[in-house]
Amino acid sequence: MKIAIVSGKDEGPTKLNAFDNALLAAGIGDVNLIKVSSMLWGNTELQDFVPLKPGSMVKCVLSSITSDNPGDEITAVVAVAIGENLGCVVEETGTNENPAELKDKAIFMVKYMMEIRNETIKEIVVKEITHKVEKSGSAIASVVYLNDEIVGWCGKMDERDKKIATDLAYKIIKEVGRKIRPYVGHPESGEYIKIGADGTPT
């Protein structure tokens, strides 16, 4: 199992829009989120977040808080504990509470969940985000469950993306040791890079 941890915060004209904008800020605003209970496979791999295909069905553990009371400080926290046989996730939120204390509470809870299951903790990762409300604000932290079906390019490729795609294709050619001529890029954007058998763009 592979996961990524993301967070975002933002304002909006309404509480719903603020929440939506916070999801967009976290990179998960263009997918359908399916909230799951807080269990992971053993030796779950934590990865950097990558763009997701718009409209995908994405499983996640979501910690979210929204307020339309100006001046409120809202905090969302997720804590992940990874073990050999399984892992656990907890979420915690608070309004005008000490973020450090909320993090400590989340860590305590996830440690307890692992302890009650007689599972030794190999790693704990915590993500916290705090936002001071101006009008209507929201903060979210989420553990996203990744798979090949939901990961993909989003939008047009800039020069940095083109270089990454070119370097990746060249690396594949060298490692596999076969004569291949892949096209890399986003078919819908109309921007392609054709890689020759020698690994150079053509």
What do these predicted regions represent?
Residues 1-202:
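Helix-coil modules at protein/domain termini and other flexible surface or pore-lining loops
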